[in-house]
Amino acid sequence: MPYTLEVCVDSTASALAAMRGGAHRLELCADLVIGGTTPSLALLQQVKAETGLPVRALLRPRFGDFCYDRWELAQMAQSAARLVEAGADGIVTGVLTPEGDVDVEALQPIYAAARAAAQRAGRPVACTLHRAFDVCRDPFAALEAARALGLSTILTSGQAPSAPEGAALLKRLVEAAGPELEILVGAGVTPENLPALAAATGARAFHLSGKRVLDSRMTFRREGVPMGLPGFSEFALWQTDAGVIRRARSALDSLVPLLSSWQNNFIRR
């Protein structure tokens, strides 16, 4: 597959929209409005059954930073095993030390739990380092830590608020990663900027949610009793827009002939 389009979803409705739009794979989480947390087993199993797409499940026990205590780390290892047993094709996680380095010692048992569960099931599992990478101290040291951990993917914006702003670092990361470690470009990715991002970075994998805000089906609405984030309406729901994903997939597909032409010219030389 010359290019990969991964869509981040937190509901079955969003997963189905991503599938209809042409997503190659899904990252599944809960609570995308706060950056995502670990999804339930029921949601994972439902999404797998309804879409048939490869699904990588997020491991994040809470909102906030990526420096976890021993109870949270134990939860993450247990969740890794259970999610893979329930059908997850991969796990997506990250842990940092207080000093801002990738916490290899903390991550090893989490990835080991996922791999052991996959081995018992007789299938492979993909392991991704998520955007904890974007707030680490040294991105190239973090890349080498990911390589040492045997990871397949790093999800990153190039340590910037959005991928277009991080394009220069993303290009360097793609070059440093080589063919065996996928740099998955995420944050601020749109159908409109995908071709330019691909050209500027050399990346082959892109991540977006493609979300829209839907109005709740509730007709009775008691205002002034917040149940979640202050300032965020209880009646505004995030959901992936199949049309956005379709345009993103089309943008990537349009690059394939250009890539093939470049490869043919290179071979002829």
Question: Predicted segment positions?
Answer:
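Active-site mouth loops of central-metabolism enzymes
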Residues: 2-10, 59-75, 96, 128-138
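Glycine/small-residue-rich loop that forms an oxyanion/phosphate-binding "nest" at active or ligand-binding sites
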Residues: 47, 53-107
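C-terminal alpha-helical cap/extension of soluble enzyme domains
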Residues: 180-262, 266-269
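Catalytic cores of alpha/beta
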Residues: 13-15, 68-79, 137-148, 189-204, ...
